[in-house]
């Protein structure tokens, strides 16, 4: 079997591999992931590794220092800094959703939401992108 015989077999694999690259899939599957570069102190646990890991209307995107399921119908604008490790996880953070400034608050919980960041500086960089 020469090169011409192998080509029809290889073309579908080449095309599928190209579509699965993040840059190509984003254009096909809807809105692209936010392109916000931030320097984080601690690696975060990924919520997802591929789009099917996320609930309907959400997309698996690199966000802050891990991969998160993001809902593009919402604006991500809440920040936090970790106060205590592990259990119970109490966080301090702020919101700019209404006032468009970061204000501190303390909350506890095991998972929180996608609107959280390790420092106020990271929050401000991220939130500035959306306002």
From Swiss-Prot:
Signal peptide: 1-25
BPTI/Kunitz inhibitor domain ranges (all copies): 70-128
Primary location recorded for the protein, binned into one broad class: secreted
Keyword Transcription: no
GO molecular function list: serine-type endopeptidase inhibitor activity
Reported tissue expression: Ubiquitously expressed, but the highest levels are found in epididymis, testis and trachea.
Gene3D superfamilies assigned: Elafin-like, Pancreatic trypsin inhibitor Kunitz domain
Keywords for the protein's UniProt record, in alphabetical order: Disulfide bond, Protease inhibitor, Secreted, Serine protease inhibitor, Signal
Keyword Nucleotidyltransferase: no
Covalent S-S links between cysteines: 33-61, 48-60, 54-69, 79-127, 102-123
Compartments, as annotated in UniProt: Secreted
GO CC annotation: extracellular region
All residue ranges annotated as the WAP domain in the record: 26-73
Domain of life according to the entry: Eukaryota
PANTHER family: EPPIN, WAP FOUR-DISULFIDE CORE DOMAIN PROTEIN 6A
Identification of the protein by name: WAP four-disulfide core domain protein 6
Gene assigned in the entry: WFDC6
């Amino acid at each position: 079997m020469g090169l011409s015989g192998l080509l029809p077999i290889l073309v579908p694999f080449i095309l599928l591999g190209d579509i699965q690259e993040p840059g190509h899939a984003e254009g096909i599957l809807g809105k692209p992931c936010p392109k916000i570069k931030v320097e984080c102190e601690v690696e975060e646990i990924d919520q997802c590794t591929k789009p099917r890991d996320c609930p309907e209307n959400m997309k698996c995107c690199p966000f802050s220092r891990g991969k998160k399921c993001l809902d593009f119908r919402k604006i991500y604008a809440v920040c936090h800094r970790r106060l205590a490790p592990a259990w119970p996880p109490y966080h301090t953070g702020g919101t700019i959703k209404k006032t468009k400034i970061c204000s501190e608050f303390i909350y506890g919980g095991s998972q929180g939401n996608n609107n959280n960041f390790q420092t106020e500086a990271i929050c401000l960089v991220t939130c500035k992108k959306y306002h």
